[in-house]
Amino acid sequence: MKLKNLISDGEKVQVFECEGKCVKVFKDPKEPKSVVLYEAITHTRVEETGYGKIPEFEEIVKIDGKYAIIYQYAEGKTLAALMREDPAKRDEYLQQMVDLQLEINSLSSAKVSRLKDYLNRSIDGLDMIDDVKKYELLTHLNKMPTHSKLCHGDLAPDNIIVGSGGVFVVDWLKAKQGNASADVAKTYLNLCLDHRTESAEKYLKLYCERSNTDAGYIREWLPIVAAAQLKFKKPDQRELLLAFIDMTDIRN
C-alpha cells in the first residue's frame, strides 16, 4: 500500500487517506502490539453498541515495518475546520457537538474499560502533584457516582467529521464506560486547552440546558479529569491543568 494524502501528523501517529480508506500509521516501528490491538478492540466494541456514526474498523496491517490500522474513510471537514471557516455559526456547531455527546452517552458497553478505574490509576501514578493533593483527588473520585454510560473520552471539534455522507465521530482510543458528566468535563477541558475558553463555557451552558444537568456537578469532575491528563500534556498545557486542579473547589 502506497501512503499518500496526509490528513494529520501527530506526535505518535500519522493519518492518511489512501484508496478510499483511512490509514492510521504508528510512527514508532517498535510500538507495542498491545497498544495497537487495544485501540482496534476498543473501536470495535464501540461499533458493537450499534452507534451509527463511527467509521468501520477494517484491519491491522504493517506498512514499511510499522503497524497501521485501516478504517472506513469518513469524507468531509472537521467541526474545528468549519468553526474556523464560519465563526458566526459557532453556537450552531457547538450545539451539534452537544447532541452528539448526548447520543454517545445514551449508549452503554460492558466491554470497554471502566472510566473510574482509569482515572484512579492515572492519578495514583502521578509524580507532579504532592501526596496530599493526590489523596484529595482520589477521595473525591471515590465519592463521585459510578455509571456505565459510553464515554468517548476525547470528544473535541477535531474528532467530528461533517460531510455529505453524514456526521462521523472518530478517535475512540480513550472510550470508556462511566459517568457522562466526566466525559463532558473532558470535552470542556479539551476546548480550554485549545485556547477556546469562550467556546468551552458556551458548550457547558448548552449541554446543561439540553440535558438538565447542573453545571456545578460537571465542574466537580474538572480537577479529576485535569489531573488524569497531566502526564500526557506539554509544559504550557500542564500549567493550565494544574490551575484547574488548584483552583477548582473539591467538596469532600
Description of each model-found segment:
Residues 47-59:
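Conserved HxN/HPN-centered segment at the entrance to the catalytic loop
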Residues 64-78:
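Conserved short submotifs of the Hanks-type protein kinase catalytic core
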Residues 79-87:
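AlphaC helix of the protein kinase catalytic domain
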Residues 4-37, 44:
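ATP-binding glycine-rich loop module of kinase domains
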Residues 168-171:
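Pre-DFG segment of protein kinase catalytic domains
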Residues 88-116:
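Internal "kinase-insert"/substrate-recognition segments embedded within catalytic cores
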Residues 106-153, 157, 163, 243, ...:
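An alpha-helical support segment within catalytic cores of ATP-dependent transferases
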Residues 186-252:
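Helix-rich C-terminal or lid/interface subdomains of diverse kinases
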